């Protein structure tokens, strides 16, 4: 088992140290807080990416419209 590049023995050591530092009553609360923080970070990241995509699309449309306006149109005789 390899989670985030951390093997099972390392993960067990980390959990034991966390248990010793925070105690069994605080660990669920800390886990919830970390989960909420991770979720909020992912949401903010997703919103940022969506905004970048919207801005890029708007710029591309603007450039395309400008190019179409500047290009000479052929007139049929």
Curated annotation (Swiss-Prot):
InterPro entries: TatA/B/E, TatA/E
Keywords tagged on the record: Cell inner membrane, Cell membrane, Membrane, Protein transport, Translocation, Transmembrane, Transmembrane helix, Transport
Annotated membrane topology: Single-pass membrane protein
Entry GO MF terms: protein transmembrane transporter activity
Presence of the UniProt keyword Transmembrane helix in the record: yes
Broad class of where this protein is predominantly found: membrane
Residue stretches spanning the membrane: 3-23
Superkingdom of origin organism: Bacteria
Biological process annotations from GO: protein transport by the Tat complex
Subcellular location as annotated: Cell inner membrane
NCBIfam families: PRK14857.1, PRK14861.1, tatAE
Family: Belongs to the TatA/E family.
Assembly mode: Forms a complex with TatC.
Name of this chain's protein: Sec-independent protein translocase protein TatA
């Amino acid at each position: 088992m390899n989670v985030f590049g951390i093997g099972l023995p390392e993960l067990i050591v980390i959990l034991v140290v966390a248990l010793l530092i925070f105690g069994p009553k605080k660990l669920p609360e800390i886990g919830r807080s970390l989960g909420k923080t991770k979720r909020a970070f992912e949401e903010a990241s997703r919103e940022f990416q969506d905004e970048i995509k919207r801005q890029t699309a708007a710029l591309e449309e603007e450039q395309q419209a400008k190019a179409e306006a500047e290009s000479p149109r052929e007139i049929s005789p």
